[in-house]
Amino acid sequence: MVDTMMNTNTDGVTAVPPIFPLPSTTPNRNNNNELAMLAQKQIVAGLLLQQPTIVQAAVNGTNSQKHLADIDYTNVIQTLQALGTTNLKAFSLLLDPQSQTSQLISEDTRPSASSSPSSTATAVSNSGQSNATSTSSSSTEPEYKPRNVREKVYADGYIMSFDKKSCCGTKEFWRCERKNDCNARMHSDINTREIVRKLHPHNHEKPSPEELAFYEQDFSTLHPNYCHPVKSINRSYMQRKLSRASHVSQALPIAPQQIKAEPMEVDTTNQTIQNFQQNNNLMLLASINAAATAAAAATSAGISPPVVGQKRVSTTVMPITLKSQRTTPKEEEDSSQLMSQEEFRITYELTKKLMEMMKPKTEIGVRWQGDEGSILLFLSHDNGAEENVFFPVVVMNRDEKSLITALEGFTGKRCEGKLALCYSQRVNVLVHEALISNWTHGKLFLVNTDAPALWRLTPVDAFGEPLNHV
């Protein structure tokens, strides 16, 4: 029975209509379009007629070259060349064995597809596979990631940003997310994400709990020696959110339960109210007495009471209400700190005495009974010792020459350069007559003669500390 059906189907196949031959003369553009449309229709009709026979032969395993020989490929190639000369778009067909209908899938606008005959044949034969491939590939497309967004991880309490992979392909390099300010770097294993090396410590504090809350992840359970992926959050966006939240929290009003008056303020307010009530009562009593006195005086003077139609004059004096000046706790504290004149004088005298006692002794109190033009100084060698012994030296005249002569006699050396006062390591002032004339008796100096070109005198106080004035 199967053989009978196969013979019947084979005998019932209609012959393929011939392809419209290509004319020898070159037609105009309109004739080319009509020719291409007619050739296209005939190719589709021939393929549809061949489809049932080809499918049945493939199912029974009796497929042969018999049916393929019915198609004139020479005419097909000539027709496709005609399509290419008229610049028409190539087309592809999807042949469905079940529905036995053709469906137009896509059109390619590239000229290379229309100029090549093999490309059109390949599109027709592989149209079914391309549709299935496109459907399966759409479901397995990778997740879209925007450009210039690097992966971020949480490692050792900090947020790190991906930098690059090593040339050997076994390590990943990470940088601190504040890469413009912080130079910290880190290397991790590419498979286990374990930290294998740390370079350059961070120059900032670890992210605060408020900043970590943006990542919506519990970081307390994570191992500090591994890299844990986190969401990629823009740091400037995070800072704006935190700044706005801090401003809002500062602008919120204080709850009534949080407002508690200080004891001093409560007592002061109660006392002010009591004083105001007492003053008001006294003023009211005085006004009543004044009104009674005025009424008695009017009666004794014979003044008749006002009659109807006249304007009544009120003899009642209303009490004057004075607005109390409420003082703040700060004003009361300032007023309580004010001293009387006597207390201020005593405090001033004590402070003056203390300042005089604390003032460093820059000279030794001596009574000079010699010549008024000479001066008595106490000199010691500046040799870096902790204790210095000062010797009295008399300068005969208040000038530089006499001072150098006295120093040469004290040191036993000859001064071949200048003489300067050393106030610090950087400040040296040359000695001159106007400076020496203001000196008083008993001043202390350390003499340094290490540099022959410049001898230095360092003024010190009674404790051996250098002075910045003489």
From Swiss-Prot:
A zinc finger (FLYWCH-type) spans 145-204. Pfam families: FLYWCH. GO terms for biological process: negative regulation of DNA-templated transcription; nematode larval development. Disruption phenotype: Knockout causes a nearly wild-type phenotype, but a few young larvae have morphological abnormalities. In a flh-1 mutant background, L1 larvae have severe morphological abnormalities and/or appear necrotic, and 100% die before reaching the L2 larval stage. Embryos exhibit significantly lower expression of lin-14, and overexpression of micro-RNAs, including lin-4, mir-48, mir-241, and mir-34. In a flh-3 mutant background, embryos exhibit significant overexpression of micro-RNAs, including lin-4, mir-48, mir-230, and mir-65. Residues 111-140 have a biased composition (Low complexity). Residues 102-148 are annotated as: Disordered. It comes from the Eukaryota. Keywords: Metal-binding, Zinc, Zinc-finger. The keyword Zinc-finger applies. GO terms for cellular component: nucleus. GO terms for molecular function: DNA-binding transcription factor activity; sequence-specific DNA binding; zinc ion binding. InterPro entries: FLYWCH-type_ZF (IPR052887), Znf_FLYWCH (IPR007588). Probable transcription factor. May bind to the promoters of target genes, including micro-RNA genes, in order to repress expression, and acting redundantly with flh-1 and flh-3. PANTHER family: FLYWCH TRANSCRIPTION FACTOR 2, FLYWCH ZINC FINGER TRANSCRIPTION FACTOR HOMOLOG. This is FLYWCH transcription factor 2. It comes from Caenorhabditis elegans.
